[in-house]
Protein backbone atom coordinates (compact mmCIF):
# COMPACT_ATOMS: atom_id res chain seq x y z
CA UNK A 1 0.00 0.00 0.00
CA UNK A 2 1.18 3.49 -0.80
CA UNK A 3 1.99 5.76 2.12
CA UNK A 4 -0.56 8.60 2.76
CA UNK A 5 1.01 11.84 1.61
CA UNK A 6 0.48 15.16 3.32
CA UNK A 7 0.45 18.12 0.99
CA UNK A 8 -0.65 18.99 -2.49
CA UNK A 9 -1.00 16.13 -4.94
CA UNK A 10 0.97 15.86 -8.17
CA UNK A 11 -0.75 16.83 -11.35
CA UNK A 12 -1.87 14.04 -13.68
CA UNK A 13 0.92 12.54 -15.90
CA UNK A 14 3.62 12.75 -13.27
CA UNK A 15 4.90 9.68 -11.48
CA UNK A 16 5.40 9.83 -7.76
CA UNK A 17 8.91 9.05 -6.51
CA UNK A 18 8.79 5.99 -4.30
CA UNK A 19 10.59 5.44 -1.04
CA UNK A 20 13.56 3.17 -0.47
CA UNK A 21 11.29 0.28 0.48
CA UNK A 22 9.35 0.67 -2.76
CA UNK A 23 12.61 0.69 -4.72
CA UNK A 24 13.66 -2.57 -3.05
CA UNK A 25 10.33 -4.17 -3.87
CA UNK A 26 10.36 -3.14 -7.53
CA UNK A 27 13.35 -4.82 -9.19
CA UNK A 28 15.41 -2.51 -11.37
CA UNK A 29 16.23 -3.59 -14.93
CA UNK A 30 19.26 -5.98 -15.04
CA UNK A 31 22.17 -5.20 -17.36
CA UNK A 32 23.58 -8.46 -18.74
CA UNK A 33 22.34 -12.03 -19.38
CA UNK A 34 18.97 -12.75 -17.84
CA UNK A 35 17.96 -15.97 -16.10
CA UNK A 36 16.10 -18.56 -18.22
CA UNK A 37 12.36 -18.89 -17.77
CA UNK A 38 10.96 -20.93 -14.83
CA UNK A 39 13.86 -19.78 -12.62
CA UNK A 40 13.43 -17.23 -9.83
CA UNK A 41 15.98 -14.77 -8.60
CA UNK A 42 17.02 -14.83 -4.94
CA UNK A 43 14.99 -12.01 -3.39
CA UNK A 44 14.04 -10.95 0.12
CA UNK A 45 11.12 -12.22 2.21
CA UNK A 46 9.00 -9.26 1.23
CA UNK A 47 9.32 -10.07 -2.45
CA UNK A 48 8.36 -13.72 -1.71
CA UNK A 49 5.25 -12.59 0.10
CA UNK A 50 4.32 -10.26 -2.79
CA UNK A 51 4.86 -13.10 -5.26
CA UNK A 52 2.73 -15.44 -3.16
CA UNK A 53 -0.07 -12.93 -3.06
CA UNK A 54 0.20 -12.32 -6.79
CA UNK A 55 0.25 -16.09 -7.49
CA UNK A 56 -2.84 -16.54 -5.34
CA UNK A 57 -4.53 -13.75 -7.24
CA UNK A 58 -3.55 -15.31 -10.59
CA UNK A 59 -4.78 -18.75 -9.48
CA UNK A 60 -8.11 -17.27 -8.53
CA UNK A 61 -8.40 -15.66 -11.92
CA UNK A 62 -7.45 -18.96 -13.61
CA UNK A 63 -10.11 -20.84 -11.65
CA UNK A 64 -12.69 -18.32 -12.63
CA UNK A 65 -11.62 -18.62 -16.27
CA UNK A 66 -11.79 -22.44 -16.05
CA UNK A 67 -15.26 -22.25 -14.62
CA UNK A 68 -16.26 -20.04 -17.49
CA UNK A 69 -14.63 -22.11 -20.23
CA UNK A 70 -15.83 -25.56 -19.08
CA UNK A 71 -14.24 -29.06 -18.83
CA UNK A 72 -12.37 -28.80 -22.14
CA UNK A 73 -10.38 -25.83 -20.94
CA UNK A 74 -9.60 -27.69 -17.70
CA UNK A 75 -8.18 -30.64 -19.62
CA UNK A 76 -6.03 -28.35 -21.77
CA UNK A 77 -4.75 -26.60 -18.69
CA UNK A 78 -3.98 -29.94 -17.00
CA UNK A 79 -2.04 -31.22 -20.01
CA UNK A 80 -0.10 -27.97 -20.16
CA UNK A 81 0.83 -28.30 -16.47
CA UNK A 82 2.05 -31.88 -17.04
CA UNK A 83 4.22 -30.72 -19.95
CA UNK A 84 5.67 -27.97 -17.77
CA UNK A 85 6.52 -30.52 -15.06
CA UNK A 86 8.28 -32.76 -17.60
CA UNK A 87 10.34 -29.86 -18.94
CA UNK A 88 11.54 -28.75 -15.48
CA UNK A 89 15.29 -29.14 -15.05
CA UNK A 90 16.04 -29.67 -18.78
CA UNK A 91 18.65 -27.60 -20.64
CA UNK A 92 19.56 -27.69 -24.29
CA UNK A 93 17.70 -28.52 -27.48
CA UNK A 94 14.61 -30.69 -27.14
CA UNK A 95 14.38 -34.14 -28.71
CA UNK A 96 12.35 -34.46 -31.90
CA UNK A 97 8.91 -36.06 -31.60
CA UNK A 98 8.93 -39.87 -31.51
CA UNK A 99 12.11 -40.22 -29.43
CA UNK A 100 12.05 -41.47 -25.86
CA UNK A 101 13.52 -39.25 -23.21
CA UNK A 102 16.36 -40.91 -21.31
CA UNK A 103 16.63 -40.87 -17.54
CA UNK A 104 19.00 -38.54 -15.74
CA UNK A 105 21.20 -41.48 -14.66
CA UNK A 106 21.03 -44.37 -17.14
CA UNK A 107 21.65 -47.85 -15.65
CA UNK A 108 25.16 -49.18 -15.90
CA UNK A 109 25.79 -52.24 -18.11
CA UNK A 110 25.87 -55.49 -16.11
CA UNK A 111 29.12 -57.48 -16.29
CA UNK A 112 28.57 -61.19 -15.67
CA UNK A 113 25.61 -63.57 -15.74
CA UNK A 114 22.20 -61.92 -15.78
CA UNK A 115 19.56 -62.55 -13.15
CA UNK A 116 16.85 -65.08 -14.02
CA UNK A 117 13.38 -63.73 -14.80
CA UNK A 118 11.35 -62.86 -11.75
CA UNK A 119 14.28 -61.63 -9.64
CA UNK A 120 14.86 -58.00 -8.69
CA UNK A 121 18.17 -56.28 -8.17
CA UNK A 122 19.22 -55.52 -4.62
CA UNK A 123 19.30 -51.78 -5.41
CA UNK A 124 15.66 -51.83 -6.52
CA UNK A 125 14.72 -53.68 -3.36
CA UNK A 126 16.52 -51.12 -1.23
CA UNK A 127 14.79 -48.28 -3.13
CA UNK A 128 11.42 -49.89 -2.51
CA UNK A 129 12.25 -50.24 1.15
CA UNK A 130 13.20 -46.56 1.31
CA UNK A 131 10.00 -45.52 -0.41
CA UNK A 132 7.73 -47.16 2.15
CA UNK A 133 9.69 -48.20 5.28
CA UNK A 134 6.45 -48.67 7.18
CA UNK A 135 5.30 -51.40 4.84
CA UNK A 136 8.69 -53.14 5.08
CA UNK A 137 8.51 -53.15 8.88
CA UNK A 138 5.02 -54.63 8.81
CA UNK A 139 6.12 -57.35 6.35
CA UNK A 140 9.08 -58.32 8.51
CA UNK A 141 6.91 -58.41 11.62
CA UNK A 142 4.37 -60.61 9.83
CA UNK A 143 7.14 -63.00 8.71
CA UNK A 144 8.44 -63.29 12.26
CA UNK A 145 5.00 -64.17 13.60
CA UNK A 146 4.64 -67.16 11.21
CA UNK A 147 5.85 -70.46 12.72
CA UNK A 148 5.68 -73.69 10.76
CA UNK A 149 4.97 -74.55 7.13
CA UNK A 150 2.93 -72.12 5.08
CA UNK A 151 -0.50 -73.20 3.86
CA UNK A 152 -0.92 -74.10 0.21
CA UNK A 153 -1.59 -71.15 -2.07
CA UNK A 154 -3.50 -73.05 -4.73
CA UNK A 155 -6.40 -75.47 -4.42
CA UNK A 156 -5.48 -78.80 -2.78
CA UNK A 157 -6.88 -81.88 -4.54
CA UNK A 158 -6.82 -84.66 -1.94
CA UNK A 159 -8.84 -87.80 -2.23
CA UNK A 160 -8.68 -90.76 0.15
CA UNK A 161 -9.49 -93.35 -2.52
CA UNK A 162 -6.74 -92.16 -4.86
CA UNK A 163 -4.27 -92.20 -1.98
CA UNK A 164 -5.18 -95.83 -1.16
CA UNK A 165 -4.87 -96.82 -4.82
CA UNK A 166 -1.41 -95.25 -5.10
CA UNK A 167 -0.26 -97.02 -1.95
CA UNK A 168 -1.54 -100.38 -3.20
CA UNK A 169 0.23 -99.83 -6.54
CA UNK A 170 3.52 -99.09 -4.76
CA UNK A 171 3.24 -102.24 -2.63
CA UNK A 172 2.48 -104.34 -5.71
CA UNK A 173 5.52 -102.98 -7.56
CA UNK A 174 7.70 -103.62 -4.52
CA UNK A 175 6.56 -107.24 -4.25
CA UNK A 176 7.02 -107.93 -7.96
CA UNK A 177 10.49 -106.41 -7.95
CA UNK A 178 11.39 -108.41 -4.85
CA UNK A 179 10.57 -111.69 -6.64
CA UNK A 180 12.85 -110.72 -9.51
CA UNK A 181 15.69 -109.77 -7.18
CA UNK A 182 15.46 -112.99 -5.14
CA UNK A 183 16.62 -115.06 -8.12
CA UNK A 184 19.88 -113.09 -8.32
CA UNK A 185 22.70 -114.11 -5.94
CA UNK A 186 23.48 -111.62 -3.21
CA UNK A 187 27.05 -110.38 -3.63
CA UNK A 188 28.80 -108.10 -1.20
CA UNK A 189 30.44 -104.96 -2.41
CA UNK A 190 34.19 -104.79 -2.90
CA UNK A 191 34.80 -102.47 0.07
CA UNK A 192 33.39 -105.18 2.36
CA UNK A 193 35.58 -108.01 1.07
CA UNK A 194 38.85 -106.29 0.11
CA UNK A 195 41.47 -104.64 2.23
CA UNK A 196 42.00 -100.91 1.84
CA UNK A 197 45.18 -99.74 0.07
CA UNK A 198 48.33 -99.65 2.14
CA UNK A 199 48.75 -96.42 4.04
CA UNK A 200 52.15 -94.84 3.81
CA UNK A 201 53.95 -93.53 6.87
CA UNK A 202 53.44 -89.79 6.62
CA UNK A 203 56.76 -88.61 7.99
CA UNK A 204 57.05 -91.50 10.49
CA UNK A 205 59.01 -93.98 8.36
CA UNK A 206 62.78 -94.59 8.44
CA UNK A 207 64.83 -91.73 7.08
CA UNK A 208 67.27 -93.92 5.16
CA UNK A 209 67.63 -95.18 1.62
CA UNK A 210 66.04 -98.45 0.61
CA UNK A 211 68.40 -101.37 0.92
CA UNK A 212 66.43 -103.51 -1.52
CA UNK A 213 64.75 -102.30 -4.67
CA UNK A 214 61.88 -104.82 -4.52
CA UNK A 215 60.84 -104.15 -0.96
CA UNK A 216 57.32 -105.52 -1.31
CA UNK A 217 55.10 -106.82 1.44
CA UNK A 218 53.71 -110.35 1.52
CA UNK A 219 50.38 -111.60 0.34
CA UNK A 220 47.70 -109.61 2.18
CA UNK A 221 44.81 -111.57 0.72
CA UNK A 222 44.92 -114.11 3.58
CA UNK A 223 43.01 -111.61 5.72
CA UNK A 224 40.00 -111.69 3.42
CA UNK A 225 40.18 -115.17 1.90
CA UNK A 226 37.01 -117.23 2.08
CA UNK A 227 37.11 -121.05 2.36
CA UNK A 228 36.48 -121.29 -1.38
CA UNK A 229 39.45 -119.00 -2.07
CA UNK A 230 41.72 -121.08 0.18
CA UNK A 231 40.69 -124.28 -1.58
CA UNK A 232 41.32 -122.74 -4.98
CA UNK A 233 44.79 -121.54 -3.94
CA UNK A 234 45.68 -124.98 -2.56
CA UNK A 235 44.72 -126.59 -5.86
CA UNK A 236 46.83 -124.07 -7.75
CA UNK A 237 49.90 -124.79 -5.61
CA UNK A 238 49.47 -128.56 -6.07
CA UNK A 239 49.22 -128.14 -9.83
CA UNK A 240 52.33 -125.95 -9.81
CA UNK A 241 54.26 -128.62 -7.89
CA UNK A 242 53.15 -131.36 -10.28
CA UNK A 243 54.20 -129.30 -13.27
CA UNK A 244 57.64 -128.66 -11.72
CA UNK A 245 58.14 -132.39 -10.98
CA UNK A 246 57.16 -133.26 -14.54
CA UNK A 247 59.73 -130.80 -15.83
CA UNK A 248 62.40 -132.48 -13.71
CA UNK A 249 61.46 -135.89 -15.05
CA UNK A 250 61.66 -134.63 -18.58
CA UNK A 251 65.44 -134.31 -18.28
CA UNK A 252 66.04 -137.87 -19.42
CA UNK A 253 69.64 -138.98 -19.53
CA UNK A 254 71.03 -139.84 -22.90
CA UNK A 255 72.56 -143.26 -23.68
CA UNK A 256 76.11 -141.91 -23.43
CA UNK A 257 75.48 -140.40 -20.00
CA UNK A 258 73.98 -143.65 -18.73
CA UNK A 259 76.95 -145.66 -19.95
CA UNK A 260 79.45 -143.27 -18.40
CA UNK A 261 77.55 -143.21 -15.10
CA UNK A 262 77.67 -147.01 -14.83
CA UNK A 263 81.41 -147.00 -15.48
CA UNK A 264 82.01 -144.38 -12.76
CA UNK A 265 79.93 -146.24 -10.18
CA UNK A 266 81.73 -149.56 -10.88
CA UNK A 267 85.12 -147.84 -10.62
CA UNK A 268 84.20 -146.24 -7.29
CA UNK A 269 83.04 -149.55 -5.83
CA UNK A 270 86.19 -151.36 -6.91
CA UNK A 271 88.89 -148.74 -6.47
CA UNK A 272 87.55 -146.25 -3.87
CA UNK A 273 86.51 -146.86 -0.26
CA UNK A 274 83.20 -145.91 1.31
CA UNK A 275 82.51 -142.31 2.23
CA UNK A 276 82.66 -141.19 5.84
CA UNK A 277 78.91 -140.54 5.88
CA UNK A 278 78.12 -144.10 4.83
CA UNK A 279 80.53 -145.53 7.42
CA UNK A 280 78.93 -143.42 10.17
CA UNK A 281 75.40 -144.55 9.22
CA UNK A 282 76.45 -148.21 9.32
CA UNK A 283 77.95 -147.77 12.79
CA UNK A 284 74.78 -146.13 14.10
CA UNK A 285 72.59 -148.92 12.74
CA UNK A 286 74.73 -151.64 14.29
CA UNK A 287 74.83 -149.82 17.64
CA UNK A 288 71.04 -149.44 17.68
CA UNK A 289 70.62 -153.18 16.99
CA UNK A 290 73.00 -154.05 19.86
CA UNK A 291 71.16 -151.75 22.28
CA UNK A 292 67.89 -153.52 21.56
CA UNK A 293 69.36 -156.92 22.36
CA UNK A 294 70.91 -155.78 25.70
CA UNK A 295 68.83 -156.33 28.87
CA UNK A 296 67.45 -153.18 30.48
CA UNK A 297 69.13 -152.22 33.77
CA UNK A 298 68.54 -149.52 36.35
CA UNK A 299 70.77 -146.58 35.62
CA UNK A 300 71.60 -143.74 38.03
CA UNK A 301 69.95 -140.38 37.29
CA UNK A 302 71.69 -138.44 34.57
CA UNK A 303 70.47 -134.91 34.05
CA UNK A 304 71.52 -134.56 30.42
CA UNK A 305 70.15 -137.92 29.37
CA UNK A 306 66.95 -138.04 31.39
CA UNK A 307 65.92 -134.39 30.96
CA UNK A 308 67.37 -134.21 27.44
CA UNK A 309 68.83 -130.78 28.07
CA UNK A 310 70.75 -129.14 25.21
CA UNK A 311 69.79 -131.89 22.82
CA UNK A 312 67.95 -131.93 19.55
CA UNK A 313 64.48 -133.37 19.45
CA UNK A 314 63.44 -135.75 16.71
CA UNK A 315 62.07 -133.03 14.42
CA UNK A 316 65.28 -130.99 14.56
CA UNK A 317 67.35 -134.10 14.08
CA UNK A 318 65.46 -135.19 10.98
CA UNK A 319 65.60 -131.68 9.50
CA UNK A 320 69.37 -131.53 10.01
CA UNK A 321 69.92 -134.93 8.40
CA UNK A 322 67.72 -134.05 5.46
CA UNK A 323 69.61 -130.82 4.95
CA UNK A 324 72.96 -132.58 5.03
CA UNK A 325 71.82 -135.07 2.42
CA UNK A 326 71.08 -132.22 0.05
CA UNK A 327 74.74 -131.23 -0.03
CA UNK A 328 75.28 -133.78 -2.76
CA UNK A 329 72.58 -132.17 -4.90
CA UNK A 330 73.86 -128.65 -4.32
CA UNK A 331 77.47 -129.28 -5.21
CA UNK A 332 77.02 -132.10 -7.74
CA UNK A 333 76.82 -132.04 -11.50
CA UNK A 334 73.68 -131.13 -13.41
CA UNK A 335 71.08 -133.61 -14.52
CA UNK A 336 71.76 -133.03 -18.18
CA UNK A 337 75.18 -133.41 -19.85
CA UNK A 338 76.79 -134.99 -16.81
CA UNK A 339 80.05 -135.71 -18.56
CA UNK A 340 81.97 -133.48 -20.91
UniProtKB/Swiss-Prot annotation:
Residue positions, PTM N-acetylalanine: 2
Q: Which Pfam families match?
A: DUF3752
List of residues that carry Phosphothreonine: 138
What residue spans carry the Pro residues bias annotation?
A: 107-116
- Disulfide-bond pairs as recorded: none
Q: Where is this cross-link: Glycyl lysine isopeptide (Lys-Gly) (interchain with G-Cter in SUMO2)?
A: 271, 308
Keywords from UniProt, A to Z, are: Acetylation, Isopeptide bond, Phosphoprotein, Ubl conjugation
Kindly state the positions of the motif GPALPP motif 2 in this protein.
Answer: 32-37
Positions bearing Phosphoserine: 28, 105, 140-141
Positions occupied by motif GPALPP motif 1: 7-12
Motif GPALPP motif 4: where in chain: 112-117
Q: Does the keyword Cell cycle apply?
A: no
Indicate which residues form the motif GPALPP motif 3: 92-97
Kindly provide the name given to this protein in its UniProt entry: GPALPP motifs-containing protein 1
Source species of the chain: Homo sapiens (Human)
Q: What is the lineage of its organism?
A: Eukaryota, Metazoa, Chordata, Craniata, Vertebrata
Tell me what gene encodes this: GPALPP1
Amino acid sequence: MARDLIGPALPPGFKARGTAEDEERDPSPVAGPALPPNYKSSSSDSSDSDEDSSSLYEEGNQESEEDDSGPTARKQRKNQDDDDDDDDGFFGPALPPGFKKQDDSPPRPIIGPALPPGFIKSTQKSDKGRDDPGQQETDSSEDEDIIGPMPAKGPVNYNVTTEFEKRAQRMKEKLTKGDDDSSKPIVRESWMTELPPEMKDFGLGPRTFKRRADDTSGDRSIWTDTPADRERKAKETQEARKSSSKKDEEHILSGRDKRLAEQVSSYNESKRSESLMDIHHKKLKSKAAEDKNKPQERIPFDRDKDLKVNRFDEAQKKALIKKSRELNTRFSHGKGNMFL
